[in-house]
C-alpha cells in the first residue's frame, strides 16, 4: 500500500476535481482517483448556470476561453408550437469532455496527485483510516475519503432510490443542419414526448447536445431500441423532429445510464463525504447539476479545512439544496406523464412568464451562494 494521504477523492468529475484543487491549494496531500484514463464524454446536459460560472472562475478557469457558448433562451414544446422565453439569468454550454479535463489539469497544478485508469472497487474505514481497493488490485489509504463518483454508485455505498427512480438517460452529440442550427441559436429547447423529455442545446465546435430521459416502461414498450425511441420522439414532437431532421450523429451510439435516483438528497452523514450527484441528484431539465456539484465541493473544502466533520457538511449541504431538488423533482414528475405535460403546456400558453419563473425557482438559493463566499448578484449579471 502507498503512503497515507490526507484526502482521497474518488471521482474526477466536476465535484471531485474542484474539491481536490481546493484542498491541494491549501497544502493538503490529495490523491484523486478517476476510472477513465483519458478525456471522455458523460451523460450530462452540459448546462452551466451563472452560479456554476462563478465557482469555475473562483477555481481559476475561464469557461469562455475553453469554448463555452452562451445560452440565452429556453423553450418547451409538445405536439404544438414551442413556447420560448429569455432565461432570467446568464447561462453557457460546455462539453464535459473539455470541462472535466480542464478541471483535472487545474487540480494537478494545485498539487493534487491524479491516478487515472483504475477506479475504486471498494471503500472501507479501518482503524480511523480509509482504504480503497482499485480495479487494478492496488490499495490506497487516506485520513478522509470523499465520494464524488457522479451518477455511478460504488459497491457498498449505493444511494437509495429517489422519488423518481424509473428513468433512463441518453446523450448524443450531433451536427444539426445549418438552418436548424441557426434556428436553435443560443437556446436550450426542452421537447416533451409520451414517457419522457429531451433537451437540445448548442455546445462548442458548432455541435449540439441531445440529452433525454425516458421512463423505463415506455422504452421497454418500444423494444428497448434507440432507433425506435428516436422515431417515437419525432412522431410525437414535430418541433424536435424538425430540429433533428438531417442531423449527423457524432458518435457511433448514444451514451446511456439507468437507475438514476432523481430527487435523492443525502441528509445525514454515513462516514465519508458525499459530493455532487452522490449527495444530491436534481432532474436534468433544471440544468443545475454542475452548480450543485461545484457548490458541494467548495462547501466540503471549507468544512474540512475549518475542522468540521462529514456529518456536519452533509447536513449543511442538504439544507442548501433540498428545496430546489424537491421543486425540480415535482416538475420532472409532471414532465414524463401525459396529463402533466398537458397541464404544463396549457399553463405556459396562459402564463408565458411561468417558464422563466420555473427556471429561476430551480437555482441555488442566494443564501447558499453567500455561504460559499459568492455574490448572488454576480450570478445574475450577464457578460458585457
Outline where the language-model segments fall.
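Predominantly flavin-linked oxidoreductase catalytic cores and closely associated redox partners
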Residues: 106-240
Amino acid at each position: 500500500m502507498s503512503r497515507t494521504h490526507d484526502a482521497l477523492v474518488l471521482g474526477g468529475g466536476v465535484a471531485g476535481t474542484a474539491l481536490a484543487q481546493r484542498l491541494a491549494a491549501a497544502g493538503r496531500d490529495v490523491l484523486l482517483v478517476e476510472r477513465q484514463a483519458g478525456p471522455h464524454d458523460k451523460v450530462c446536459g452540459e448546462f452551466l448556470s451563472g452560479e456554476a460560472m462563478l465557482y469555475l472562475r473562483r477555481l481559476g478557469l475561464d469557461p469562455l476561453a475553453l469554448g463555452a457558448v452562451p445560452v440565452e433562451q429556453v423553450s418547451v414544446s409538445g405536439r404544438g408550437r414551442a413556447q420560448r422565453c429569455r432565461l432570467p439569468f446568464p447561462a453557457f454550454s460546455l462539453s464535459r469532455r473539455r470541462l472535466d479535463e480542464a478541471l483535472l489539469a487545474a487540480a494537478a497544478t494545485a498539487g493534487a496527485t491524479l491516478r487515472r485508469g483504475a477506479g475504486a472497487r471498494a471503500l472501507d474505514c479501518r482503524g480511523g483510516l480509509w482504504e480503497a481497493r482499485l480495479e487494478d488490485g492496488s490499495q490506497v489509504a487516506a485520513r478522509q475519503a470523499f465520494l464524488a463518483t457522479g451518477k455511478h454508485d460504488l459497491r457498498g455505498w449505493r444511494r437509495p432510490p429517489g422519488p423518481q427512480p424509473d428513468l433512463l438517460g441518453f446523450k448524443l452529440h450531433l451536427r444539426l443542419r445549418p438552418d436548424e442550427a441557426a434556428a436553435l441559436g443560443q437556446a436550450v429547447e426542452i421537447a416533451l414526448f409520451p414517457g419522457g423529455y429531451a433537451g437540445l442545446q448548442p455546445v462548442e465546435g458548432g455541435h449540439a447536445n441531445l440529452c433525454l430521459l425516458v421512463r423505463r416502461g415506455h422504452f421497454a414498450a418500444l423494444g428497448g431500441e434507440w432507433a425506435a425511441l428516436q422515431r417515437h420522439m419525432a412522431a410525437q414532437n414535430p418541433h424536435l423532429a424538425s430540429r433533428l431532421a438531417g442531423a449527423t450523429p457524432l458518435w457511433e451510439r448514444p451514451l446511456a445510464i439507468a437507475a438514476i435516483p432523481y430527487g435523492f438528497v443525502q441528509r445525514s452523514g454515513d462516514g465519508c463525504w458525499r459530493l455532487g450527484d452522490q449527495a444530491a441528484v436534481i432532474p436534468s431539465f433544471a440544468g443545475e447539476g454542475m452548480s450543485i456539484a461545484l457548490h458541494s465541493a467548495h462547501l466540503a473544502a471549507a468544512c474540512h479545512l475549518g475542522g468540521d466533520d462529514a456529518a456536519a457538511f452533509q447536513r449543511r449541504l442538504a439544507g442548501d439544496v433540498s428545496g430546489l431538488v424537491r421543486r425540480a423533482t415535482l416538475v420532472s414528475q409532471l414532465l414524463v406523464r401525459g396529463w402533466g405535460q398537458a397541464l404544463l403546456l396549457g399553463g405556459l400558453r396562459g402564463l408565458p412568464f411561468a417558464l422563466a419563473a420555473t427556471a429561476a425557482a430551480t437555482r441555488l438559493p442566494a443564501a447558499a451562494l453567500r455561504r460559499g463566499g459568492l455574490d448572488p448578484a454576480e450570478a445574475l449579471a450577464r457578460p458585457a
